[in-house]
């Protein structure tokens, strides 16, 4: 889903603030086997996709805070928002989601205090040229919503658990004779 309208600052903040809860709702109850699910050989695992979303979100939040608090004026947005290397989760899922939610809350609190000048402040990207902090938030919102849709779709495709019965040590299980009578 592509966002067709330009997001206002309030819309971008609202979308960004909703991401941790959306992720949490989608991944609630996923076990290790489900996190290792890969829809095809060219796709990341479900856990890898979740890790990517959490990691890139945390990196973007750090960039926004540094731009505001330290005056950062140059950044590789593509490398921050969508790094080429996708990592697997390296800690328990709920811990990673909770940490991301804490970081995002702090960022959203900061964004709520921004005025027009801060939203329009320019950051130089070697690939995209000059972009405003609002443009960064719009791009992040599109990126995160796209990955949330991917996670939703992948969780819908997860294979159902199947009871294969007791182990058989490689021998055929005797089957009862059919009842013909």
Give the ranges of each region predicted by the language model.
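Short, contiguous alpha-helical
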Residues: 1-2, 13-14, 35-80, 122-181
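A short, mixed-charge helix-start or loop-turn motif at secondary-structure junctions
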Residues: 2-9, 85-93, 126-133
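Short amphipathic alpha-helical segments with heptad-repeat character
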Residues: 10-17, 50, 54, 94-101, ...
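Long, hydrophobic N-terminal alpha-helical segment
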Residues: 11, 16-23, 27-34, 41
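Small-residue-biased structural context
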Residues: 12-15, 20, 86-93, 105, ...
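Structural signal for well-ordered, non-membrane alpha-helices
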Residues: 20-31, 57-61, 101-115, 145-155
């Amino acid at each position: 889903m592509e966002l067709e309208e330009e997001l206002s600052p309030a819309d971008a903040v609202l979308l960004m603030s909703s991401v941790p809860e959306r992720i949490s709702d989608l991944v609630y109850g996923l076990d290790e086997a489900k996190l290792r699910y890969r829809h095809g050989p060219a796709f990341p695992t479900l856990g890898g996709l979740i890790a990517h979303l959490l990691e890139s979100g945390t990196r973007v939040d750090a960039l926004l805070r540094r731009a505001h608090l330290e005056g950062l004026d140059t950044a590789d947005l593509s490398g921050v928002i969508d790094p080429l290397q996708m990592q697997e989760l390296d800690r328990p899922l709920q811990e990673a989601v909770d940490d991301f939610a804490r970081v995002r809350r702090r960022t959203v609190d900061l964004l709520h205090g921004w005025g027009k000048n801060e939203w329009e402040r320019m950051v130089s990207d070697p690939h995209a040229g000059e972009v405003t902090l609002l443009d960064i938030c719009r791009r992040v919102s599109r990126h995160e919503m796209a990955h949330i849709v991917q996670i939703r779709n992948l969780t819908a495709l997860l294979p159902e658990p199947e009871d294969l019965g007791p182990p058989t040590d490689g021998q055929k299980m005797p089957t009862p004779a059919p009842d013909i009578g």
